[in-house]
Amino acid sequence: MKKRRSKKERQELLQQTIESNPFITDEDLAEKFQVSIQTVRLDRMELSIPELRERIKHVATKQHEEDVKSLPLEEVVGEIIDIELDRHAISIFEVKIEHVFKRNQIARGHHLFAQANSLAVAVIDEELALTAKSTIRYIRPVKLGERVVAKARVEDVENDKGRTVVKVRSFVGEELVFTGTFEMYRSSNYSEEGNNL
């Protein structure tokens, strides 16, 4: 039988765990440390560690507003937590009651698509980026309360069609739930007459 950690020891480990993974939930912390969710919340309060939503907002700093050129951050579905233009980006989307079917609490597919598509637009290093074509696959239903982490990677900039290819993979925990390949037009390919579209 495992010896219970002291409060001080548990709080030190809790702080280290949150520093290494700021997106961990109170529920996951409670399970990890074999204590109640209320104990985790009290420990966080004593250590002045904000709740998950505030930690996510803190990570999605003002810097990202300056980084993203192709659309305002408020138009991105989910919160961008990491981005390097024309390379990769990550966003987090919390599935809430307004995102699910009432009957079965499963997220409507267009929300997962919108998260992936808006991330594919945001990662493009141009003032104008439009989706020309997408190939998507839903792997498993996402449910109310789950957190979807979308990871976009730019695979091919200015390919033979003059488009940029962005691949997006979305996860709940470690489980892949959605994939998408997006062919993007960029403003460098756009003419006033629309000839390049």
Swiss-Prot record:
Example GO molecular function: DNA binding
GO biological process terms on file: fatty acid biosynthetic process; negative regulation of DNA-templated transcription; negative regulation of fatty acid biosynthetic process
Keyword annotations of the record: DNA-binding, Fatty acid biosynthesis, Fatty acid metabolism, Lipid biosynthesis, Lipid metabolism, Repressor, Transcription, Transcription regulation
SUPFAM superfamilies for this protein: Thioesterase/thiol ester dehydrase-isomerase, Winged helix' DNA-binding domain
Pfam families named among the record's database cross-references: 4HBT
Gene3D superfamilies: Hotdog Thioesterase, Winged helix-like DNA-binding domain superfamily/Winged helix DNA-binding domain
Assigned protein family: Belongs to the FapR family.
HAMAP family, per the entry: Transcrip_fact_FapR
Function summary: Transcriptional factor involved in regulation of membrane lipid biosynthesis by repressing genes involved in fatty acid and phospholipid metabolism.
NCBIfam families: PRK04424.1
Name of the protein in question: Transcription factor FapR
Organism: Bacillus cereus (strain ATCC 14579 / DSM 31 / CCUG 7414 / JCM 2152 / NBRC 15305 / NCIMB 9373 / NCTC 2599 / NRRL B-3711)
Organism lineage: Bacteria, Bacillati, Bacillota, Bacilli, Bacillales
